[in-house]
Regions:
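Bacterial N-terminal signal peptides that target proteins for export
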Residues: 1-8
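N-terminal signal peptide c-region/cleavage motif recognized by signal peptidases
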Residues: 14-17
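Metal-dependent phosphoester/phosphodiester hydrolase catalytic core
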Residues: 21-326
Length: 326
């Protein structure tokens, strides 16, 4: 009888061997991609053989004046369409906007062109006509998928459409702690409180502006402390491993609050004009990086861990962290 079992045993061992070496699911992510500047970073990202790419905002630079005329934004999208590499069309793409693809620098709920801007955004990213984003105000959404037994829940926030007006001038914004001041707005908060309850092993939360950073002079969640406190409480109460992705800053960094990590990946091709990387923050883990960069996340279902890294334009490692999936 033994000869009959040996082939089956051999095939079983081969199967187990292949399973143990299953490739992690790879997600690259980044922000701040100017259509008028060369984009050499794409060839580097292609070498990582990613499964998906997340655009975290400022995916074009098409600011118009506050009148809501969108000629500049339309032209920016048209030019960017010819700049994005063809291989991206073979990957899963997830995108949110920030101010420069919203249409107004640091713009919020009062921007007159926001409805038409949303239509331009959805059409550019080829969002299917039956997608809820065509019927709602704002571009927030969620998406679920499973890789190697890990249930991943992607939650994408809109930090522009409903956001209250900023208090103060550019680079001198003041804290807005009014009870009614908001970033997400009532409808989006209600939606978030529902979808975040979905069964998942890993939550990836996309926000165009930084959630954890507090020290710099630019836009951030901490300008609206009540909103930030509400978000951190929501995340803190989760039993699910949660990672926050953000952009906007034209510099990159990794932050940690309790058990929550935030990775800011910015910029893909428009790095900070302020070359110093000396920015500090109580939640910042490493020195910030001010040249072109992108983020890379590896979801390893075999070992139940997530590895996320910041990489430079040549694909060299800047910083990396690894966390276990609960």
């Amino acid at each position: 009888m033994k000869p009959y079992y040996r082939p089956a045993l051999f095939l079983l061992l081969i199967s187990l061997s292949n399973a143990s070496y299953s490739d992690p699911y790879k997600i690259a992510f980044g922000s701040c991609l100017d259509q008028d500047i060369p984009q050499p970073i794409w060839s580097t990202i292609q070498r990582d053989e990613v499964n998906a790419f997340i655009f975290l905002g400022d995916n074009v630079y098409g600011d118009d004046d506050s009148s809501g005329e969108l000629d500049t934004l339309r032209a920016a999208y048209s030019k960017q369409r010819s700049k994005l590499p063809s291989w991206l069309s073979e990957k899963e793409i997830y995108s949110i906007w920030d101010d420069h693809d919203y249409g107004e620098n640091d713009g919020g709920s009062l921007y007159k062109g926001k409805r038409e801007s949303q239509e331009l955004f959805l059409n550019f990213w080829k969002i299917p006509n039956n997608d809820q984003r065509h019927d709602q105000e704002g571009i927030y959404f969620d998406h679920e998928f499973t890789t190697d037994g890990v249930k991943v829940h992607l939650i994408a926030l809109d930090t522009r459409y409903f956001r209250s007006e900023l208090d103060g001038g550019f680079r001198s914004y003041k804290i807005n702690d009014d009870d009614g001041a908001t970033i997400l707005g009532n409808d989006q908060w209600s939606w978030l409180n529902n979808v975040i309850k979905k069964d998942a092993d890993l939550i990836i939360l996309m926000t165009s502006i930084q959630l954890l950073a507090t020290n710099h002079a630019y836009e951030k969640w901490s300008l609206f402390p009540n909103e930030r406190k509400k978000m951190l409480k929501l995340i803190d109460n989760l039993d699910t491993t949660t990672i926050v992705l953000s952009g906007d800053r034209h510099r990159a960094g990794i932050y940690k609050y309790n058990n929550v990590y935030e990775i800011t990946a910015s910029a893909l091709n428009k790095p900070s004009s302020r070359k110093s990387s000396n920015e500090t923050d109580p939640l910042l883990l490493h020195e910030m990086y001010v040249k072109e960069n992108y983020g890379l996340m590896l979801i390893d279902g075999i070992n139940k861990e997530v590895k996320f890294s910041l990489k430079d334009i040549g694909g060299n490692l800047i910083n990396t962290e690894t966390i276990q999936i609960k």
